[in-house]
Amino acid sequence: LPARGWVERGQKSGGMFGGLAFSRSASNDPTLTENFRRWFGDSKVVDSAGKPLVVYHGTKSVITEFDGSKTADGGFHFGTSAQANMRVSGEGKNLMPVYLSASSLQRSKDLGGNWKAKIKAAQASGKDGIVYLNRYEGLSSEVISRLSGEGLLDKLDRMSDTEFRRAVPEAEDSYIVFHPTQIKSAIGNNGNFDPANPDIRFSRRK
C-alpha cells in the first residue's frame, strides 16, 4: 500500500516530539506534522517500516463524517484498495484513502463476515479496533484459481492465519475501527487532525 514517510531525524524548526522531528507545515507531508503525530499517537496501523499506512474504504457515498448508526455491525471497515474495491459493486464507487488511529487492536480471524459480535467483544475488552488477515477480499483471480486448483478454497475457514499466510503470501490485513474520530482523510485534510472532531477532511477545532 502507498504510505507516506513520517520519520525525519535531526533538528528542525518545527520542534521535536518523542525523539523525532516534525514540521509545523503540512504542505509537503501531513504525517510529518506535530498535529498528525498527536492524533496518530501509538497507532498500530502502520506498514512494515512502522510508517503510517494509507488504507481505503469503499463506498458509493460522499462521506465527510462516518456514522456508526449507518453501519450493519457498528464498525468502520478499511483495507487495501483491492479489498475496498471488492466491497462495492457497480458504478459510482468511491475508494477513500485514510489514516487510522488505533493503538489497541484485537487480532481476529476472518470468517467471511459476521463482525457484530466480535466488535462488541473487542469494545468490551477496551480495544479500539480489530485487525484481521483478509481471506476473502482483495485476492486476484490468479490467486483464487490457484487455491481452487490446490483444493484449498473450501478449507479457508479451517486454516490458521499462519497456514493461510503460507498458502497466500500476498494476503493483506484489513482493519475495523469503532469511532469516527479515529479516521482522517489522507488527502484534502487541512492539517489540524483534531482528535475531537469526526470530520475526516478538515478536522477543524470548534
Annotated model-derived regions:
Residues 1-206:
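Active-site and NAD+-binding cores of ADP-ribose-processing enzymes
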